[in-house]
């Protein structure tokens, strides 16, 4: 596991944007003749990835990267919100990313939170991921309690896509988007920790002092289902990109180690 420490959230977003650009461009550069498999990426919502999406949009407009052969799978969606609801993750992704890049609509995959059969929706989502040969890169964020996607504390670290009841802490944290805590849905469909761990590469963005304890638990303590993001310690190719504020709880030795190790590293 790598830890990349940047000065602020803008620098962290820029770094991750460059990684994504390199991974996508390298994939198509090295793809064998006759192989039509697209690049498959998992995507999050929330405030943390916004600088990343903004930068990728700029790169796309400048023709530094194309999404025409990229397939996306979003991490989660609220149960009960229509796709055109302004607080749904469908709406968020189209408003902040998909409407501004050259991606094909049929290559966009987001869980349907209004389906009558949640179990079947989740089963089909897993099957569709596998039909593409798995996810090449999963981009994610981290909650203040160390959750990844909507895999709340106590979630199985081998879990697959399913319906989850949200914790009070998550509901409170997400109420800033709804302006009223009573409007925040109490359930969501989410990819599982196991689904994320199956990706060939995982990148987490962690910014802000509020994430400091979660980052400490994820990096310096053992793998623990009460801090689901800690599972990435077991992944063979994972990167956490954070800002200085998020390192507040790390030991000085840990901080210096990663700063030294990554000082001369590339993407």
UniProtKB/Swiss-Prot annotation:
Superkingdom of source:
Eukaryota
- Which Gene Ontology CC terms are recorded? cytoplasm
| Membrane spanning residue stretches | none
Q: Where in the cell is it found?
A: Cytoplasm
Where in the sequence is the active site?
Answer: 76 (proton acceptor), 145 (for ring-opening step), 147 (proton acceptor), 152 (for ring-opening step)
Q: What is its main location?
A: cytoplasm
Subunit-level organization: Homohexamer.
- Supply the name of the protein: Glucosamine-6-phosphate deaminase
Protein's organism: Dictyostelium discoideum
Classification lineage: Eukaryota, Amoebozoa, Evosea, Eumycetozoa, Dictyostelia
């Amino acid at each position: 596991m790598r830890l990349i420490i940047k000065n602020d959230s803008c620098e962290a977003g820029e770094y991750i944007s460059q990684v994504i650009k390199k991974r996508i461009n390298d994939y198509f550069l090295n793809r064998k003749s006759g192989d039509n498999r697209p690049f498959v990426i998992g995507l999050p919502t929330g405030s943390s990835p916004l600088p990343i999406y903004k930068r990728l949009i700029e790169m796309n407009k400048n023709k530094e990267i194309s999404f025409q052969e990229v397939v996306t799978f979003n991490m989660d969606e609220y149960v009960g919100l229509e796709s055109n609801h302004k607080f749904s993750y469908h709406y968020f992704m189209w408003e902040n990313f998909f409407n501004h890049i050259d991606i094909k609509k049929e290559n966009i995959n987001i869980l349907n939170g209004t389906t009558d059969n949640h179990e079947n929706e989740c089963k089909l989502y897993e099957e569709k991921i596998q039909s593409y040969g798995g996810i090449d890169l999963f981009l994610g964020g981290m909650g203040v309690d160390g959750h990844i996607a909507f895999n709340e504390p106590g979630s199985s670290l081998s879990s697959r896509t399913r319906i989850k009841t949200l914790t009070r802490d998550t509901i409170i944290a997400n109420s800033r988007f709804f302006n009223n805590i009573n409007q925040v849905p109490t359930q969501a469909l989410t990819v599982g920790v196991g689904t994320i761990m199956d990706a060939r590469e995982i990148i987490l963005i962690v910014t802000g002092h509020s994430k400091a304890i979660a980052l400490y638990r994820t990096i310096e303590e053992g793998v623990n289902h009460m801090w689901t993001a800690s599972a990435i310690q077991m992944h063979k190719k994972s990167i956490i990109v954070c800002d200085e504020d998020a390192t507040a709880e790390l030991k000085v030795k840990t901080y210096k180690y990663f700063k030294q190790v990554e000082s001369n590293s590339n993407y």
